[in-house]
Amino acid sequence: MEKNKSTAIEIAESSKESKGKAPLLAAAVGHDRAAGYKRGVSIFDLFLRISAATAALAATIVMGTTEQTLPFFTQFFQFRAQYDDLPTFTFFVVGMAIVTGYLILSVPFSIVCIARPVAIGPRFLLIVGDTLKAVLATSAAGSSAAIVYLAHNGNSDANWLDICQQFNDFCQRVSGAVVAAFVAVVLLIFLIVLSAMALRKN
């Protein structure tokens, strides 16, 4: 009888210990799963960030090197079109250069988020910076898109002639730069959404 009682007591203690360890084990598994999810988001963030930087850099270089001179000229005039003839395109180059610089400098923060997926500080800085630069890129791309539209179609009410019939290469390059800028804007929006998803998991 004493042996049976002793055996019963040992089983009860073992059961009690396992009940105490079960919540801790479940919490650890949940923490690892959340960290793995955030690490996956951070890796995708890094890929999109590099892609956005590439698009913004391409837009800056293409617009900043856009120039066309027509093969005919007069004694007093030479027909040439450059991006800096229009203040809107100058703003585009400066704005997209700032966006490019920010995206390149933000890559180390994205890498930190991969190494430390549960860290909130770097992710919060990224979402603030991405939002500000998305606004800048949108304003640069949107204002330049309006000028490109006028260059292609003109405005008969204001007697603004379309110049793309004469400066075809110029218009193609500035149009390509604006398209690349909008690609960067879309990628920045995706980056903001990813950062919001990662912060929401906290």
UniProtKB/Swiss-Prot annotation:
The keyword Transmembrane helix applies. The keyword 4Fe-4S does not apply. Keywords: Cell membrane, Cell wall biogenesis/degradation, Membrane, Transmembrane, Transmembrane helix. It is found in: Cell membrane. InterPro entries: CASP/CASPL, CASP_dom, CASPL. It is a multi-pass membrane protein. Residues 1-42, 112-130, 195-202 are cytoplasmic. The chain crosses the membrane at residues 43-63, 91-111, 131-151, 174-194. One of its GO terms (cellular component) is plasma membrane. Its main location: membrane. GO terms for biological process: cell wall organization. Pfam families: CASP_dom (PF04535). Residues 64-90, 152-173 are extracellular. Regulates membrane-cell wall junctions and localized cell wall deposition. Required for establishment of the Casparian strip membrane domain (CSD) and the subsequent formation of Casparian strips, a cell wall modification of the root endodermis that determines an apoplastic barrier between the intraorganismal apoplasm and the extraorganismal apoplasm and prevents lateral diffusion. Homodimer and heterodimers. NCBIfam families: A_tha_TIGR01569. Belongs to the Casparian strip membrane proteins (CASP) family. This is Casparian strip membrane protein 1. It comes from Striga hermonthica.
